[in-house]
Amino acid sequence: MSLYRCRFLDRTLDAFQIQGLACENDAEAIVMARRMSANSDADGFELWQDERCVHREPQTT
């Protein structure tokens, strides 16, 4: 398992909360981050593994 950090973004795209998660691969981590973001007040998220930005998904309105 690999460790990832999901940074929840506010409407100005600043991180207001960080949640760790462990997943088998990037694809699984992106799915998990989407689920966590959908169940929060976030306006998007960034997914990081160490210093690598795996995925960034700001919400579009």
Across the structure, where does each feature detected by a protein language model lie?
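Short aromatic-glycine-(Arg/Gly/Cys) micro-motifs in beta-strand/loop hairpins
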Residues: 1-17
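A short, charged, amphipathic alpha-helix used as a generic interaction element across diverse proteins
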Residues: 24-42
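A short, sequence-level motif marking secondary-structure junctions
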Residues: 22-26, 58-61
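Short, mixed-charge low-complexity intrinsically disordered segments
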Residues: 39-61
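Surface-exposed loop/edge segments in extracytoplasmic proteins
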Residues: 14-19, 51-55
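A general secondary-structure boundary signal
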Residues: 15-20, 36, 44
